[in-house]
């Protein structure tokens, strides 16, 4: 896939939208000026994916796609 997605805002909704796009195979960049919040959300979503893998709802490739396709950005210029 050559499509790229930019999500502006890494709160609860933005982080979930970015995670779904990344798991679907899209190169996804998420921007938030609050570095601590964005890193917290990244780890929170990662743990949720691991729980869904444990429950056999997702396969391991979803976690790999999430990690490979999601970029965290703290500068708006880097996202667009």
Predicted regions and their residues:
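NAD(P)+-binding Rossmann beta1-loop-alpha1 motif at the extreme N-terminus of oxidoreductases
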Residues: 1-51, 55, 71
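A structured beta-alpha segment of the ubiquitous adenosine-cofactor-binding alpha/beta core
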Residues: 51-80
């Amino acid at each position: 896939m050559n499509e790229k997605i930019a999500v502006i805002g890494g709160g609860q909704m933005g982080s979930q939208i970015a995670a779904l796009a990344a798991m679907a195979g899209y190169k996804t960049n998420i921007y938030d000026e609050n570095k601590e919040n964005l890193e917290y959300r990244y780890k929170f979503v990662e743990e949720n994916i691991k729980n869904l893998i444990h429950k056999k709802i997702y396969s391991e490739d979803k976690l790999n796609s999430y990690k490979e396709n999601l970029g965290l950005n703290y500068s708006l210029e880097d996202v667009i």
